[in-house]
């Protein structure tokens, strides 16, 4: 809530919820609306969830673990952090995050510069529109490639992905 003073207030449990399988997004601070140079997004992680490895060309992501054990891989750096743990994933590095534990996890992401928070909403809308379609999967859809290009995002399948999925007993990435 902006009280006309430039102060943005988001109470506990508030924010724009964006449904994504296994890895949701709750936008806490929207960069353009709130006049901030950053965006803040909370991500819940269901047990067994891993994000699709990806690379940002425009943003750095700073993650703070709030609950559970969350694994991070950014290029050659791999770490599992508990509550209070912090990691920066610089733009240009292929990275993924996963729930490394047996309980739901949650992180806060500070994304700089802001604007990327809109990707989650647009991805959710695309996944909803593609649900039930037969034929090529979401990643083969032209709309998916257009969305990734719009946000300077590339997806990949690095050689470390299968090892992480096996070691932590994860489900495969959802998109």
Show where each model-derived region lies.
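A hydrophobic/aromatic-rich effector-binding and dimerization subdomain
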Residues: 4, 110-113, 117-134
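Short acidic-glycine-tyrosine-enriched beta hairpin
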Residues: 9-11, 33, 62, 76-94
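A short glycine-rich, His/Asp/Glu-containing loop-to-beta-strand
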Residues: 14-53, 59-60
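Short, conserved beta-strand element in jelly-roll/cupin
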Residues: 40-46, 55-74, 110-113
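Tight coil/turn sites that cap or link beta-strands
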Residues: 46-48, 83-84, 92, 102
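Hydrophobic small-molecule pocket/channel-lining residues, especially in calycin-type beta-barrels
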Residues: 49, 57, 69-70, 78, ...
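Ligand-binding loop in jelly-roll beta-barrel domains
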Residues: 91-117
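Acidic/histidine-enriched, glycine/proline-rich intrinsically disordered or flexible terminal extensions
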Residues: 126-175
């Amino acid at each position: 809530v902006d009280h006309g003073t430039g102060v943005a207030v988001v109470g506990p449990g508030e924010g724009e919820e964006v449904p994504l399988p296994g890895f949701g997004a709750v936008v806490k601070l929207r960069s353009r609306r709130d006049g901030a140079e950053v965006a803040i997004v909370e991500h819940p992680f269901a047990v067994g969830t891993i994000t699709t490895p990806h690379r940002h060309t425009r943003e750095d992501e700073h993650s703070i673990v709030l609950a559970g054990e969350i694994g991070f891989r950014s290029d050659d750096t791999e770490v599992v952090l508990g509550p209070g743990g912090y990691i920066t994933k610089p733009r240009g590095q292929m990275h993924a995050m996963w729930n490394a534990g047996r309980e739901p996890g949650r992180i806060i992401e500070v994304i700089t510069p802001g604007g990327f928070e809109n990707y989650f909403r647009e991805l959710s809308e695309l996944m909803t529109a593609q649900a039930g379609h037969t034929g090529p999967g979401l990643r083969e859809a032209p709309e998916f490639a257009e969305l990734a290009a719009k946000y300077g995002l590339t997806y990949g399948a690095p050689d470390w992905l299968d090892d992480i999925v096996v070691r932590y007993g994860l489900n495969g990435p959802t998109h």
